[in-house]
């Protein structure tokens, strides 16, 4: 079964996120559990936790259908020790918030070397950052998102994702989220079913489908291999509809959150309905 949704707002309270997801016909959703532009947030109080859990139950969202995202400020591969510690503390806080909310996944961007340390050293720092957080939490999987490779961001090659996983001690609590826009911008072709087969065969060989814990379904304004991160609405960008139809018809993408981060929230309900309709092999554009 496919879990399909979008990254919804938690404005006004975390309990509003499941309601907003249900309003657009979603069977999955992503959210920030705190302001993503701030390092710290007030601790979660029991009422907020209870209200969120009640809302998830009311709208029929299990933890397997929810893919929270951490703060964009965090850099788990930071070359400067003091800044690295700040990021590690913030990431641990994000993991603990998920644990309190009964969530089992936390999606994050791996990190950046900022042109100051070697790529290998940065990847090792990211893995160690994950180990530190996992040692102090229970039940939450750290889900590494592939990047477009913009600037000095790592995680844009499958080999880099595999290297991070290799350095994580508890393999049962590390996973990957593949963003289609990021993959395309990083040079993984998705424009035809044949290209999708090739790209995901490579993913399966290098990373392994056992680590796939979520996806971000985004078309790309950016050009193939450009290493520029610019999302677009489904079918409106340089990837086109075929990739998303192909994903909907492949059982390897069942049972994980498939989350839209496309640029027009006003048509998320339409995009979700279209994705649901593509699950039939008879589906056409």
Swiss-Prot record:
<dbReference type="GO" id="GO:0003906">
    <property type="term" value="F:DNA-(apurinic or apyrimidinic site) endonuclease activity"/>
</dbReference>
<keyword id="KW-0234">DNA repair</keyword>
<keyword id="KW-0540">Nuclease</keyword>
<dbReference type="GO" id="GO:0008833">
    <property type="term" value="F:deoxyribonuclease IV (phage-T4-induced) activity"/>
</dbReference>
<dbReference type="Pfam" id="PF01261">
    <property type="entry name" value="AP_endonuc_2"/>
</dbReference>
<feature type="binding site">
    <location>
        <position position="179"/>
    </location>
    <ligand>
        <name>Zn(2+) 2</name>
    </ligand>
</feature>
<dbReference type="InterPro" id="IPR036237">
    <property type="entry name" value="Xyl_isomerase-like_sf"/>
</dbReference>
<feature type="binding site">
    <location>
        <position position="231"/>
    </location>
    <ligand>
        <name>Zn(2+) 3</name>
    </ligand>
</feature>
<feature type="binding site">
    <location>
        <position position="261"/>
    </location>
    <ligand>
        <name>Zn(2+) 2</name>
    </ligand>
</feature>
<keyword id="KW-0255">Endonuclease</keyword>
<feature type="binding site">
    <location>
        <position position="109"/>
    </location>
    <ligand>
        <name>Zn(2+) 1</name>
    </ligand>
</feature>
<dbReference type="GO" id="GO:0008081">
    <property type="term" value="F:phosphoric diester hydrolase activity"/>
</dbReference>
<feature type="binding site">
    <location>
        <position position="145"/>
    </location>
    <ligand>
        <name>Zn(2+) 1</name>
    </ligand>
</feature>
<feature type="binding site">
    <location>
        <position position="216"/>
    </location>
    <ligand>
        <name>Zn(2+) 2</name>
    </ligand>
</feature>
<feature type="binding site">
    <location>
        <position position="182"/>
    </location>
    <ligand>
        <name>Zn(2+) 3</name>
    </ligand>
</feature>
<protein>
    <recommendedName>
        <fullName>Probable endonuclease 4</fullName>
        <ecNumber>3.1.21.2</ecNumber>
    </recommendedName>
</protein>
<keyword id="KW-0479">Metal-binding</keyword>
<comment type="function">
    <text>Endonuclease IV plays a role in DNA repair. It cleaves phosphodiester bonds at apurinic or apyrimidinic (AP) sites, generating a 3'-hydroxyl group and a 5'-terminal sugar phosphate.</text>
</comment>
<keyword id="KW-0862">Zinc</keyword>
<dbReference type="InterPro" id="IPR001719">
    <property type="entry name" value="AP_endonuc_2"/>
</dbReference>
<feature type="binding site">
    <location>
        <position position="145"/>
    </location>
    <ligand>
        <name>Zn(2+) 2</name>
    </ligand>
</feature>
<dbReference type="InterPro" id="IPR013022">
    <property type="entry name" value="Xyl_isomerase-like_TIM-brl"/>
</dbReference>
<dbReference type="InterPro" id="IPR018246">
    <property type="entry name" value="AP_endonuc_F2_Zn_BS"/>
</dbReference>
<dbReference type="GO" id="GO:0008270">
    <property type="term" value="F:zinc ion binding"/>
</dbReference>
<feature type="binding site">
    <location>
        <position position="229"/>
    </location>
    <ligand>
        <name>Zn(2+) 3</name>
    </ligand>
</feature>
<comment type="similarity">
    <text>Belongs to the AP endonuclease 2 family.</text>
</comment>
<dbReference type="GO" id="GO:0003677">
    <property type="term" value="F:DNA binding"/>
</dbReference>
<dbReference type="GO" id="GO:0006284">
    <property type="term" value="P:base-excision repair"/>
</dbReference>
<feature type="binding site">
    <location>
        <position position="69"/>
    </location>
    <ligand>
        <name>Zn(2+) 1</name>
    </ligand>
</feature>
<keyword id="KW-0378">Hydrolase</keyword>
<keyword id="KW-0227">DNA damage</keyword>
């Amino acid at each position: 079964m496919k879990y399909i949704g979008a990254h919804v707002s938690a404005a006004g309270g975390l309990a509003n996120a499941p309601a907003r997801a249900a309003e657009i016909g979603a069977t999955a959703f992503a959210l920030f559990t705190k302001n993503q532009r701030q390092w710290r947030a007030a601790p979660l109080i029991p009422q907020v936790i209870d209200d969120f859990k009640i809302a998830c139950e009311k709208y029929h969202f299990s933890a397997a259908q929810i893919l929270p995202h951490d703060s964009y400020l965090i850099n788990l591969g930071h070359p400067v020790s003091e800044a690295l510690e700040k990021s590690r503390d913030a990431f641990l806080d994000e993991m603990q918030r998920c644990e309190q909310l009964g969530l089992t996944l936390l999606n994050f961007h791996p990190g950046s070397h900022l042109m100051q340390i070697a790529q290998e050293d940065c990847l090792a720092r990211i893995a160690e950052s994950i180990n530190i957080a996992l040692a102090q939490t229970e039940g939450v999987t750290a889900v590494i998102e592939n990047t477009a490779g913009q600037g000095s961001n790592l995680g844009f090659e499958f080999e880099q994702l595999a290297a991070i996983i290799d350095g994580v001690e508890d393999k049962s609590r590390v996973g990957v989220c593949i963003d289609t826009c990021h993959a395309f911008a990083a040079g993984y072709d998705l424009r035809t079913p044949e290209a999708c087969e090739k790209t995901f065969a490579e993913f399966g060989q290098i990373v392994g489908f056992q680590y796939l814990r979520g996806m971000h379904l985004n078309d790309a304004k950016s050009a193939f291999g450009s290493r520029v991160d610019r999302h677009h609405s489904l079918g409106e960008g340089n990837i086109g509809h075929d990739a998303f139809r192909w994903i909907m018809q492949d059982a390897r993408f069942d049972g994980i959150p498939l989350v839209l981060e496309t640029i027009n929230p006003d048509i998320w309900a339409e995009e979700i309905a279209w994705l649901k309709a593509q699950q039939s092999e008879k589906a056409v554009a």
